[in-house]
Structures are given as structure tokens and as C-alpha cells.
UniProtKB/Swiss-Prot annotation:
Record's protein name: Methionine synthase reductase
SUPFAM superfamilies tied to this protein: Ferredoxin reductase-like, C-terminal NADP-linked domain, Flavoproteins, Riboflavin synthase domain-like
Residue ranges of domain FAD-binding FR-type in the record: 269-531
Residue span, Flavodoxin-like domain: 4-147
Enzyme class: oxidoreductase
Binding site for FAD: R449, P450, Y451, S452, G485, V486, C487, T488, W695
The organism of origin for this protein: Mus musculus
Binding site for FMN: 10-14, 93-124
Name of the coding gene: Mtrr
Swiss-Prot/TrEMBL keywords: Amino-acid biosynthesis, Cytoplasm, FAD, Flavoprotein, FMN, Methionine biosynthesis, NADP, Oxidoreductase, Phosphoprotein, S-adenosyl-L-methionine
The reaction(s) this protein catalyses: 2 methylcob(III)alamin-[methionine synthase] + 2 S-adenosyl-L-homocysteine + NADP(+) + H(+) = 2 cob(II)alamin-[methionine synthase] + 2 S-adenosyl-L-methionine + NADPH; 2 cob(II)alamin + A + 2 H2O + 2 H(+) = 2 aquacob(III)alamin + AH2
Miscellaneous comment text of the record: It is debated whether the reduction of free aquacob(II)alamin occurs spontaneously or is enzyme catalyzed.
Amino acid sequence: MRRFLLLYATQRGQAKAIAEEISEQAVSHGFSADLHCISESEKYDLKTETGPLVMVVSTTGTGDPPDTARKFVKEIHNKTLPTDYFAHLRYGLLGLGDSEYTYFCNGGKVIDKRLQELGAQRFYDTGHADDCVGLELVVEPWIDGLWAALTKHFKSLGGQENMSDTLSRASDAPLSTAMKPELLHIQSQVELLRLEDVGERDSELREQNETNRGQQGRIEDFDSSLVHSVPPLSQSSLSIPAVPPEYLEVHLQESLGQEENQASVPSGDPSFQVPISKAIRLTTNDAVKSTLLLELDISKIEFSHQPGDSFNVTCPNSDREVEELLQRLQLADKRAHRVILKIKTDTKKKGAALPAHVPEGRSLQFILTWCLEIRAVPKKAFLRALAEHTSSATEKRRLQELCSKQGAADYNRFIRDASVCLLDLLLTFPSCQPPLSLLLEHLPKLQPRPYSCASSSLRHPDKLHFVFNIVEFPPSTTAASPRKGVCTGWLATLVAPFLQPNTDVSNADSGDTLAPEIRISPRATNAFHLPEDPSAPIIMVGPGTGVAPFVGFLQHREKLQEQHPDGKFGAMWLFFGCRHKDRDYLFREELRHFLKTGVLTHLKVSFSRDAAPDGEEAPAKYVQDNLQRHSQQVARTLLQENGYIYVCGDAKNMAKDVNDTLIGIISNEAGVDKLEAMKTLATLKQEKRYLQDIWS
């Protein structure tokens, strides 16, 4: 068979699943995929690779390559590498991203760009799949086209076609080869800012997204639902994926009664069990969202951190949802049985391996509670597998529709956008009775949840604060009862017995109630820290819980000023926003204290739901409105005083709006056009003077 090297760079398993799908399909097209995680550098060597390379690369954080690709990215960015280092290499790359974030698909773009700079050439156009509208809209046609591109590549090696023809489509690389080397990175950053009037590829993406939304809109005109389709889909012949090969053999053994706890959860990072020493409600009871602050006692562990860092919290699934799942799977009487896994001897799955996130010999209840993401939105391959275990012909057909090419719009509307999970499907399709092995094959690892540090170790030695909203999901057509966020709901229940009402954080007492413990682990360090030069002015933009790291910044700066009374410290601006002044103004007293003492130079607060008193000017509704009102000072800080700007909070709307506002401010105040303003902002990002800590 014709061999190609297939590498994936994954953060949460999405890229791995797609790469495995490519590997499975390869055989039927006459190819053999040599599949590896990009971090397994001992198993491949791109410098001597003779076969074509196919890569699937995800994006994490604010446009970073995934953790598994960090070493690879660092190595290929070695400045001593010659420009023909990869001249022998022919590749195709599929990037995964989310257009709700500013730096869409940047993980893939960084690698794609560097491979080009080192002489590699594409045998197949790069794909950019958007999780905002559905990865499969790009992933499926990209995989379909891959086989023809590979066939053409191998034919060209045999002299049947001219290599230049094979590679002609690679000539549309986004960066001009005539561009000066020092401008390459800036130009790349500008491209990734994704303004609507710049970039041919982005316009194509938007057209594709609009087409998809149009498909969904047409469906809404009919009485379709998760369980029911309408013409033309209900009458169409379906193109559905092949049934994923089963590969796990599961045995349930009666337990000997061993004790199980969080420490049994597999983790690649060092983790620590720490007590919660304080819990405070920061919002009033009538606030739209409930926001809590938790204080952790880290005095017994080595856990160094600084303001701007984040850390992971290991959390379980909801007890109620686990119980419902056990009942629905008819396994409630075996909840305490130990789960023993083996690879099926006759499996057709290439490279089948036991899931690393399922510990050996743990109880079924423990695995469903601590190891599997039972809230995960099922991928189409999972739906296809579930259809094979559905006895009702009507229900089976509907599951097949939802995983078919023809049913892509229905999948987006009723599965992905509705955040439907396995339990929802099993309750909606009562004749579906999958074996436990299928769940263990398809449910991903229950991921720890990241939180920003909201305190300084200088102000609170041996303590660690973090802040979160209790995420709540109202009842829906698939979930009859309301649900809370997996981690935030669990934490809220955990601290309910000793939760203190809205109060000044610094004056809150540690309760006498026995403190529950949670497991935390450090995350990779980032650049979201105070400047090394304390005299540099900074602008902080953080509405809602996005203010958390900035409270840590201010605590840290206050202590530094106390320790160095003659030191020179730059101005600190904080743009904060909330809904109501009297309900969810987080850290109000502490922020006023910082303003009074001069640690905080300017505090600009916007209230999106409060009306202006009679006769007064309407207040700014959002943080970007306040930025615009102070555009001269913002521009002077960034462009003349070498200042820094930090943005923390929601990626979907706020971060984009702030980014657009900054471009407008630079354009107006510096008297340059939009493109030049984008270049300036890209330079700030490259210099790590424009930093983001955002989430969706």
C-alpha cells in the first residue's frame, strides 16, 4: 500500500479523532497511514521523511498550538535552520479552530507558515475548520478530497504527471515570498486578525458559514426536531460514515470493596489535594448570575504562582446524571463492579489501544463519575455506532440522518448547537441500547476545568483565590430538568454549607465548618503577567469574572509599592463592566480601596442594564464603550508610552468587540488606515504588549 505520514496535534482529543478517521478511511482508498501524535518525535523524522505528510492541528488558548505540539513548534522555529530544510517535504494540513476567537486556526497556521518558510510544499490545499459553525462542514469535504490529492501525488512520483501540476495549488500561500523576512511574522499576525474586509480565505469562510446558517434557517420553517425529520431529508438517500470498528472488550467483576477517591483519576500533571478555606458569594441573590469566590489553603504543598497564572480543578460529573445513565443502561445493580478492559482479538481498528483516561480495575460508578465526559456532544462517528444498537427502524433512520452528509444542518441545530449529550440521546431514542464498551470507546476524557488566579502570593501567602459564575442551563426539549455547569455546579454544592453572603473579601472569616478538599494542578505558564518593568503603564480590560486576574495584579502591585516606596510605578487603568451596580459589581470595595491608595490610577466601570438617572448622561454600557470614551489616553499609553493592554473574559463577543475598538482607536488617534492599525496591533501582540486570557 502507498504509505503517508499522518500526524495530529491535539489538546482535547478533537484532532486525534479526526486523524483516526483519516487513518480508518485510508485503507479503503488503497493507502496506509503511519499515524502518530506530533509529540512522539521518536517515531518519525521529517528531515528524512520520503512519503507525503498529512497533519491535523488544533488551536488552544488565544491562538496557541496545543500542548502536544509545543516542542515541535519550538524545534521548527530554530533560527539556524536553512530555508531548504524541508524542501523535500510534500504536505497537506487541516487546521481546527473557532472563529469566535480572534486568532482563528492559529495553531495550524503557525505550523503551515513555518513549513513553507523551510521549503516544504503543499500537495493539497490547507483546510481551516470552524467549530463555531461545525467542524464537519470543512473536515468532511477536506478528507473526501484528500484521497484524490494523494493519488495525484503518488502518480507524479511515477512520472505520469508533472510535479509542478501537482503542486500548483500550493502557489496561493498567504505570505509573499518576496516579503522581507522581518515583516513575515507581522504580516501573519495581521492576517489572523480577521477583519471582515481583509483576506480572501476569510470571505470564503464567511460565505460557507452563511450558507450553513441558511440551511438551518430553512429547516426552522418546518416541524423538525431531534427525533423527527422532514422532507427533503426524510426522503433522501443517505451518505453515512462507515460503522467505527469496535475494539474494546469489557468485563465487570464484583468489587472487593476498595476505597476510591479523586487521587485515582489519571493525570499527566502533578496534582494536589487542598482544602477550601473560604467561600464568598460576590453577587446579591437577585443578580442574573451567581458569582462565588473560593479561597484554597495551599500552605501544605509546593504550588508557586503569580497573578495572571491559571490552574486546573479536577471535577466529577453530576451524581444525578451518572445515576440516570446507570439506570438507562440497565447497569445500576453493577455500579460497584470493577471494569476490566481488553483489546478485542479480532478488532479491525488499526493501532487499537486501551483508553489512557480509564484507570484499571476501578468501579463502573467511579469511571462514569470521574473519568468520562458524559456531557460531551456526541460526534457523528458515535451517532453512527449508536444507530447499530437501535432496534426501532424509525429511530435508527433518524440517527443515521443526523450523522449523514445530508443531515449536516440537522446535526448542527439539534445536536451541536443544543449541546445534546449521550444521556439526552438515550432518553430521546428509547430503543437505543448500546453496550458499555461503546461508551468507553467514544466518550472522551473528563477534562479538568481551568480557572484564573485571583490573588497575589505577596498579599495572601499560602492562599489561592479564584472566582467563577455558577453556570446554569434551563430545561430544554431534551433535558427536562435544569442543569448546572459540570465543575461550577459541583463546587457550588460543595461549599453551600459554609458559603458567606456578599461581603468585603478581605474581611470575610474562614468558617468553622469542616472544609471540603478539591484536587488542583498547575497549568503551563503563559505571558499574562505584569510587565517586568514596573514603570510601564498598563490597561486592564475585564468585565464580569474577567476582573479576577486583575485583582491579583493590583494586590501584587500594592505590596510592591509598600516594599519599594521610592520605586517608579506606571499608571494602572482598569475597565470593568457588569450588569447592575448594586447586584454584580464584583470586588467593589477592594477596587475602591486600590483607587483611594493610588495603586489603581483610573477605574472605569460600565453597567449594561442600569438606566441613567434623569438629567444625567447615559453611562457606558460595555467596556469597549468606555475604551472609546478614553481613546486619546488609550492610544497614548500604547503608542507613545510603551504601555501594555490585558484583556480577560468572554471570547464570543467582548474580546472581539474590544479588538475592533482598539483597531478603531489606533486608526483615529494615529491618523492611519485600518490595515495599518491592524499591523500596529499585531506588533503589540508580537511584543507581548497586547495579551489576552479569554474563553468561550
